[in-house]
Amino acid sequence: MTSQYSNYSCPLNNIQVNVIGSSRTSDDHFLEQMLTKRKKTNISQDLHYLLLGLNPRELYQISFKLARIDEKKYKFNGNFNEGDYYPHKNSEIPMEDTEEIVHSDGYQTGARWMKTGVYFPKIGISKEQPDKERCLLLESLHAYFPVLVFTTSSGISLEVPVWSQKFVTTMTSSNRSVKRREKRKLEETAGPAAKKTPDIIETTPEDVVPEVYNAQYFYQMQNNTVISSESKFSSPLALQQDLTEDFGTFAQLDAHFNVSVQSCSSSSLSSPAALKHDSTVSSDSDFDDKNSEEFDAVFEYIDQQFSNHDQNPMDQQSKSIDLNQTTWAPQSINNPGYLSTASSPAALNQDSSASEKSSIVRDKKSDENCLDEFDRVFNELDQQFTPKEDQVQDLSNCTTWNQEPINNSIQSNQFINPELFYFIFHKCLIISWPSCLSCCRGSILPQHLRTPPLVPISQLLIISPLVLPPYHNFTTGSATVSPFASTPANMTIFNFTSDSSTTYSNSTTAQVFPDVANTPDLSYFNIAPAVDLSLFIDPFVQSGRDLSIERSIRNFTNTLKKAHRQKKTAILTFQSTEPMQLEFKYCTKMLLRTDKPVGNFSIQLSGPYLEHLLNLSHHLCRFSEYNLFVKAHFPRGSYGSLTSMTGPAVEIPETQENITIIWVKKDFPENVNKYPVAINSLITEAIASNGTNQVLLTSKYPSDCTIRFRKCGFMIEGVLVVKKKETVIIDRQILGELNRLKHDLLQ
């Protein structure tokens, strides 16, 4: 399987399917019930799925079908509250999958499927040969589960089972089968005229209920309560007598569970003493239906409280938030008055119906609740990792460093909740390879995330100038190249040339230079090697042009592989009939953006970057389509193309120690249009040589600015102030501490 899809940057076998609005897992053996009849009936399940792990640039067609779980025929176990089924005998019908129903949207990109999910509405089932479209033939009393079939544009298909959805098909009603059986007997004795007789056929409960309702076992399993084995559990009175034998009176039972049933408006349930009095004056013979319903309501409510208390704390909290918007909220069992909200058994029944309605609302708003849960988790992380005022150090006088690192509190022992960390990784689609792997040592991560990158994380440089509106004008800065006259650096250098400071030229080039000493006036951007070079097209681009660009991306990927095998340089060139706007991003943080459109653009890659792009791209693209991408805004009515080629090899030396820079923010004066702009970003150089212990930061800025060091994914305010066109010397050890602890937890 792996070798079959090894040519793809994101293989098909990494696809994950989650059911939206369902809390069940693949280990849950509970089988939902679906009714089948001769005509078409819609599936009672909500066929809405969330997809992960698709290749964002690959075209997929998704189909739906049902498959048999096993070769067994199932039977109802008599548990009406849970509706569970169990294998009864081997089925004579061979195991065959149903026909596939293709999604009406046809072929769509993986980014679109992962963003919106896939939904199959109005799919019907029938127990006879269906005569309508979008209807599947199923056999009664057999277990099925959904299967999603993914087909790529190249014809490769993969089936992904959805084990969290399992159901058994049953007939419409057992009463009808009994009536048909009785009518058949009448036809044999009285003749065909018996069909027209309107006599009502009486059926006994034994004919309707497949098995005896084992309420004793159900109550014992749900509440973990020891009940006398001699009890038949034939009525709530017998249940009460058994509880009285084990725990004493109802008052003692209340003390045992730390629950007190407070005043009820009904005379029969006014107090626990009244409950005891009713039990002493009643018997099996004179126990009426009214008291039976009241006891059932009380114990059903108690069961709900126990079941809500045993749930996952995170699920319980989200559930309590939703239910607070309705009529009642589940509370702790240790609260003595958690039953005081119901003044009567009728109120208990109303609360039960209200909880069912709220569960429906909760299922419909699952996406909103999920987003609220994300906000809550990241707010907690923000409060935990944001440094306090006494932890923020002044780095203006930074020639010496003898203090502890700022906010040096992110250690591996703080990630004590693997589920939460895994939750953040997969639900929020962390984009880049997390540098916190060095801190967490990969012990709490899933197996497919524990593979370390090919380069040390300390060598990854993330440069993140804050993208400001067009009126925030900057000028490019010049690098100090004297320390590098004999020491070349392994950097990807983007050289953006323009004929003036206010207008753009028709061409823009970007190349890899082996020696920075030969480029005295350039803007330096060191891209982390462990990223995937991909092209992302704006959503407003029409589908016709999108398909041509998709093919060009695949050709460029093949060019990268060819250049890597032949040890050559790959050149990526953009061409368009009209100028287009380009954006360079890394991990959704802007590296560079052109304010005005440019005509052509090319990137030259070689050396170890090709190896890192090819070997590590599959680790990153399984989380999101945004890694390192070039965003091309094609004007409406124009067409763009992407070409690639290979060139001669360019040797690049080993990477030096890199430094993390920084976000820049400035409150501009009112008259902001007087500064001409060439590129809408601040170019800040952080260059360190092997012979010095200091780093020079030079900023060509129209006014004073504040540079913030980004550490642990959060900002440290006001750590360094750079004056207008000033060069600041920063001790290397300070930057080393910041670089060692940086975490790319994107918000």
UniProtKB/Swiss-Prot annotation:
Residues 332-358 have a biased composition (Polar residues). It comes from the Eukaryota. One of its GO terms (cellular component) is nucleus. GO terms for biological process: cell fate specification; positive regulation of DNA-templated transcription; regulation of transcription by RNA polymerase II. Residues 268-289, 332-364 are annotated as: Disordered. Keywords: DNA-binding, Nucleus, Transcription, Transcription regulation. It is found in: Nucleus. The keyword Kinase does not apply. Its main location: nucleus. Residues 33-199 bind DNA. InterPro entries: p53-like_TF_DNA-bd_sf, T-box_DNA-bd, T-box_sf, TF_T-box. One of its GO terms (molecular function) is RNA polymerase II cis-regulatory region sequence-specific DNA binding. Pfam families: T-box. This is Putative T-box protein 31. It comes from Caenorhabditis elegans. The lineage of its organism: Eukaryota, Metazoa, Ecdysozoa, Nematoda, Chromadorea.
